[in-house]
Amino acid sequence: AIAAAGFDGIEIFEQDFIAHDGDPREVGEMIRAMGLEITLFQPFRDFEGLPGPLRNKAFDRAERKFDLMQELGTDLVLICSSCHPEALGGIDRAADDFRELGDRAAKRGLCIGYEALAWGRHVNDHRDAWEVVRRADHPNVGLILDSFHTLSRKIDPETIRRIPGDKIFFVQLADAPAFEMDLLYWSRHFRNMPGEGDLEVTAFMQAVMATGYAGPISLEIFNDQFRGGSPATIARDGHRSLVALMDDVAHSEPELPAVAPAVPARAEATGIAFLEFATKGAEADALETLLGTLGFTHSANHKSKALSLWTQGDIRLVVNRETKGYSSSAYTMHGTSVCDIGIAVDSAVDTVTRAQALGSASFAQPIDPGQLKIPAIRGQSGSVLHFIDDKSGLSEVWGIEFTPVATADRGTGLTRVDHIAQTMSYDEMLSWSLFYTTLFDMKKSIVVDVIDPDGLVRSQAIESPDGALRVTLNGAETHRTMAGTFLAESFHASVQHIALATDDIFATAEALAERGFSALPISLNYYGDLAARFDLDHAVLARLRAANILYDEDAKGAFFQLYSQPFAGGMFFEIVQRTDGYGGYGGPNAPFRIAAQKRLIRQKGIPKK
């Protein structure tokens, strides 16, 4: 998996080797046959500072590991700072131990790398580890740096710049969410790829590169979500994270030596250009009826395909009834679902170029004469994203490929796509987050818990700086939740709900009611609680209750939410209004919305048809 993802080498973790039943020479040959090298053997623990017989035993253990390294075919071992209860402190004592071990390693053509564990007994800071290496003054003894061990202890990474690059033998990288907990537990369970957490990994790597370091850049990740994950996905995410990280380093400090080919900058997304539904037959008819009820106009048909365009404000929804090609396959797999997301960007070509550099596969289908070739990639879970820009004429696709059939009226006051909500297994959330934040200029919010009557759903918002593109990721941990049921029944379709913006929620609610829109009925108890939580005028509260509108506030403004009833296996529409810069997504209302939806959907065990 890692060879296919584009990596050059692999570390051998001792526990993995011990669990393997193969000969070390066989392991080495297998790795090299895949075009990889063994860059490091690790970890060798509790070496330095031991007294008397314990010291002799430590050297004996080291010699045995040297034997193993030579059979594997690697020349560098990581020795982490000692946690042994009988280890003695002292920089000079440790330096003497490493100088002697360096002599032994040199006789075999091997090298020693010393790493400061964040929880080491006497050495837990890379500055102290460097001082040990400096005083050992041996060509076969160098420093190993690990971003987690430095950043978790809030050590300034700028101190790395004072270390000679040729004395740094190896660099390991890991990010992590900003938790306050025991360092060892944090490290063993919550490390993740650079960019997936909250540590200043870019600043760390800038400091490393400023030393002149030219050695391997590795990932050392311990994470409960990864342990049972797909090796191919994890490897691709790891490579993606390193490409994005080194690109960030290059842009942050251009004078540093380049370590990777230049790629276009993160794409500036200006919004959702279109959403395309794969559907057929009676399900397509029902979807189009719902769109009409929402105030959309069937404004155009594709000139050569079974595609209809539905518009309102700046919103474009495409209903695809094709019986062959990607959309037909998507329908067969997922049922009625969003099969394609069109994103408006500053440069479609540059966006795809960056996506490919990050490991995404391009996507293309045969096109008819007169059609535009719109750049596209495969996203997460096999989804497709097309990119549209103004400068290349791609935004003219609606006039070029579609024939008008009606003129859109005002509809119900919907103006644009506020956000889309994508659902995935919780174990896949980090991968989805990394996909968006490395490809687009987007920032992620903290992960929050959404209470479902049947379990927890983890939710994270990812936004462009101006809010033009907003995506919420919802990670389901059990199939019993609303999100989990959607995943199970749609075979992992991604878009579960589409939030559409209005400038006047009450006028929109009235217009929807006139068209026969069936709003999600909200419990009257909700509005009693709302009156207690917020200082709302009685008349406003009555209008909210009458229209089944939910309400929230933050420090800046207010948020109004109106939901459709679920359709097509658990998808739904949301109509929202933001006032005065409200920046959230109505999170406090989610449990009440989910409970209302669950009262309407069919019970588990009852077949669809």
Which residue stretches match the model-derived regions?
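Acidic (Asp/Glu)-rich catalytic clusters
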Residues: 2-4, 19-42, 61-73, 96-107, ...
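Acidic/histidine-rich catalytic cores of soluble enzymes
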Residues: 9-10, 41, 100-198
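Conserved beta-strand positions in the central sheet of alpha/beta enzyme cores
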Residues: 11, 40-42, 78, 113, ...
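Acidic-and-aromatic substrate-binding clefts and catalytic sites of carbohydrate-active enzymes
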Residues: 12-24, 46-56, 84-89, 119-124, ...
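Active-site acidic/histidine proton-transfer and metal-coordination neighborhood
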Residues: 37, 48-143, 152, 233, ...
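Glyoxalase I/VOC metalloenzyme domain signal
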Residues: 251, 256-300, 311-364, 376-444, ...
